[in-house]
Amino acid sequence: MATGLSQFKAKTSLLTHTRSRRTVVHCAAVVSVEQNHSFWATIEADIEAYLKKAIPIRSPVTVFEPMHYLTFAAPRTTAPALCIAACELMGNDRGHAMAAASAIHLMHGAYHAHEHLPITGRPIYKPEIQHEFEPSIELLTGDGMVPFGLELLSRSMDLAQNHNPDKILRVIIEITRLAGSEGMVDGLYRELELNDSNIDMGIIEYVCKKKEGELHACGAACGAILGGGAEDEIEKLRKYGLYVGTIKGMQNGVGKDNKGVEEKIEKLKILALKELESLKGKKMVSISSIIEPSLVVI
């Protein structure tokens, strides 16, 4: 009887310990999710405030009213916030990357405006949206948002704030490549060719990679450059951003209901997190949470 009671107590103790451990992990995960959400929400609020200050509705109203509207009408993308997070991960203040993050948002806004023009030949998977301005105005405004983003970058070249002109120039080159024919334009063009008969995992991944993937890769690389990262760190974060953006595209864009997408997303998550293995510390956990919100170190 004594032996049986002893075994019972041991099992109870083990069960209690296991439950306690699970409770600790669960509570830590909940706290981590809340902290990570706050981390990204704060960054996005700062970017929005910066853009509202940079693009107020002012004279000439015919130019700045549609630009202001289209800047904030675009759906949320995490690429600008990733730019800030990468800069902070490299040990620099987010103010160093704010203009770059805003420029990346403007690129996203410009392409969103062009994608949703009420014209024939629009991708079959693009829903109708409400238009506040004539198509010609939205077309021209989208064209104007791209150079305006580069203007924000050039104006941020303040030596008194330790902004290195060479870094700014490199970031401008990164963003112009993103906006060019081998970047998002390529993805948009390939998406135009899609129809119900030719959607397979290969074309889905390609379109998502060239659109959201390249956008996030650019954001992460620009943040790392402005944060003072070494070349290997910049390239690791570029690859991380590419995987993150491709995942985001697959989750929310073309082919999101296609069979095999979930399996591909899980593989991309593994590849993305692998790029961060050499980066340590609290900020690494924060930047990882863009694809794994419950990531926690106990």
Predicted regions and their residues:
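All-alpha prenyltransferase/terpene-synthase fold signal
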Residues: M1-I298
